Amino acid sequence: MKQLWFAMSLVTGSLLFSANASATPASGALLQQMNLASQSLNYELSFISINKQGVESLRYRHARLDNRPLAQLLQMDGPRREVVQRGNEISYFEPGLEPFTLNGDYIVDSLPSLIYTDFKRLSPYYDFISVGRTRIADRLCEVIRVVARDGTRYSYIVWMDTESKLPMRVDLLDRDGETLEQFRVIAFNVNQDISSSMQTLAKANLPPLLSVPVGEKAKFSWTPTWLPQGFSEVSSSRRPLPTMDNMPIESRLYSDGLFSFSVNVNRATPSSTDQMLRTGRRTVSTSVRDNAEITIVGELPPQTAKRIAENIKFGAAQ
C-alpha cells in the first residue's frame, strides 16, 4: 500500500508543477458544468475509492425520474452494502444493522463532496487552475486544481471528461501535496435507458425516516476570533454527553461550501489533555484552557485546527 500511495503522489506532484498551469474563470465554469452534469444526467460509474485504510470497489447509478433524483451506490466486493436516494431521502442498507432513512440532497458516502459543490460560492476564496489534459478511463479529461488562496485547507485535483463533464478522477491532497484520498472511475456509461433499469428502486418500499434529535438552542459564552476565509456558521446546538454523565457540550458547525468542521466546547475534567489526531481527511484537535476542553473536528489540516482552537475567546453570552 505504501508503494501505491508513493506512486500516486509522484503522479500528482508532476501535475502540481506544470509550467502551463494557470487560474482562469473558464476553469471555474467547467467545474460548475461538472456539478450540473452529475445531478442532471442519467449515468452509471464503476469506480474505486482509495484512502489510507484501503481500497473499495463500488458502482454508482444516477437518473432523473419525474424530475426527482434517483440514485444507488453499491459496494461490489464483500458483504452487500447499499445506499439508495429517492428525492431528498437517503436510505442505508448494511449487514447487521436495521435499515434506516435520512433526509439529504445527495449520497456522500465514497463520492467526493466536491462533485456537488457550488463553485460560484467558492470563487472568492479558491483558485481554479487549469493544468492541461490527459486520459482517464480511456476518456480525454480536463485537469483542474482547486486550491484555497489562504493556504489553510486541503486541495483537490479533478480530472473531468471533456464530453459528458462527469468526474473521472478526484484526488484530495494535503498541504504537502500528499494524496489523502482518491476517487477513480474504471468504467462508465451515459445513457437514458439507465432510468428504465432503476424503475424497481423508484417503486421499492424504503425504511422509515430516522428522527434525528435536535439540540437545544442556546447562546454560548465563547466565539472563534479567527476562521479560514470563506467559512461561516451553519448551525449551533447544546447537547448532553451520555458518556460523561450527561455533561453539556456546545457545538458550532462551520462550512465554506467545500470543507466543514465543528467547534465543540465542554467543561474540562481532571482527565482532559491536549491531543491531536488525523485520520485521512479528518482531524480531531483537543486543547484545554480556561477550565474548558475545546475540540475541533473536521476536514482541516492539523495546523489550521490548532489555530482555530487557540483563537477561541471566552466572554459574554452570544
From Swiss-Prot:
Residues 24-203 are annotated as: Responsible for oligomerization. CDD domains: RseB. PANTHER family: PTHR38782, SIGMA-E FACTOR REGULATORY PROTEIN RSEB. Homodimer. Interacts with RseA with 1:1 stoichiometry. Binding to LPS stabilizes a homotetramer that does not bind RseA. One of its GO terms (cellular component) is plasma membrane. Keywords: Lipid-binding, Periplasm, Signal, Transcription, Transcription regulation. This is Sigma-E factor regulatory protein RseB. Binding to RseA is inhibited by LPS fragments; phosphorylated N-acetylglucosamine (GlcNAc) with N-linked acyl chains are minimally necessary to disrupt binding to RseA. Once RseB is no longer bound to RseA the latter is susceptible to DegS degradation. Thus if periplasmic LPS levels increase the sigma-E regulon is induced. GO terms for biological process: negative regulation of DNA-templated transcription; protein stabilization; regulation of polysaccharide biosynthetic process. InterPro entries: MucB/RseB_C (IPR033436), MucB/RseB_C_sf (IPR038484), MucB/RseB_N (IPR033434), MucB_RseB (IPR005588). NCBIfam families: PRK09455.1. Its main location: periplasm. GO terms for molecular function: antisigma factor binding; identical protein binding; lipid binding. Negatively modulates the activity of sigma-E (RpoE) by stabilizing RseA under non-stress conditions. Although not essential for association of sigma-E with Rsea it increases their affinity 2- to 3-fold. When bound to RseA it prevents proteolysis by DegS, which is probably relieved by lipopolysaccharide binding (LPS). Disruption phenotype: About 2-fold increased sigma-E activity, 2-fold decrease in stability of RseA. Residues 1-23 form the signal peptide. The gene is rseB. The keyword Calcium does not apply.
